[in-house]
Amino acid sequence: MEREYYIEVRFRFSRLFNIDRVVRPITFAIEMTQTRKEKIMKGTLSNTTVVSIAIACALGVSVLPGRAAEAASKPSWKVTGELEEACSCRAACPCWFKSLPSRMTCDGAQVIFITKGHYGKTSLDGLAVGQFVQSPEHKSMFESFGNWNFDYVYIDDKANEEQRAALKHLSDHFFPRAAKSREFRFVPINRKIEGAEHTCTIGEYGFVSGHLIEGGLGGPPKVVNPPLADPTHKQFLQGQTTRLTYKDAAQDWKYENSNYMYNKFDVDNKVYEKHEAAMAKMIKAQGM
């Protein structure tokens, strides 16, 4: 008579980037624990077998037929827009080069103003989405990603329910989850451009005012393809803040003459899928 053995297999994934919960689950910026019982007939599992199961589940989930079909049904998307970014670092921000921030932490904000865009059949024209974050003390952006002090995303309150859901989804691509949890707020997001000065207001919480600086040979300095570049940061123009303030997440920032960046971009889901796959490989190679 066959004897039945059961083993409880516990899988724990620590992920650094929240990308797509169907296509690339390896890269979530959350910790998820899933438990199930495996029925083993007439025998026991060796340590090697247990390790093999864990690796197979960690690396192979995304290729299951059911999940592949679900991924194929995800809406395609495309966004043309402008990036406004500022942080507490001195210009240019060293964090994009895997270096330590200029101060103990990097207190940063980035806001995307969508000129034209869609998520599936949902138009995103004229909407905006932003993020405020803070890295841990004395650690680089790269080594600490996923364990930042906080991660707050602000969604344009002009968006209807469908647009809000779309912007929430896109925020996981534009702003990979930097902390263990993420807060969402729906607020007015506005921008004013007067001459060289760009001013962004994010509800009652954040204010960013900055301008481009002059390069030695004329025109603003351009940073191209830094080590941590992503599709909206493939290249950007370098500037300096006039003022960066933030009052939320138990913070009270007041910075002047710090890092400011500006860029125009045109991205879509295919560009991000390629980028996110490359980032997952880089993280794996780093042993993180």
Language model segments and positions:
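Short, low-complexity intrinsically disordered segments enriched in A/P/G/S/L with frequent Arg
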Residues: 3-4
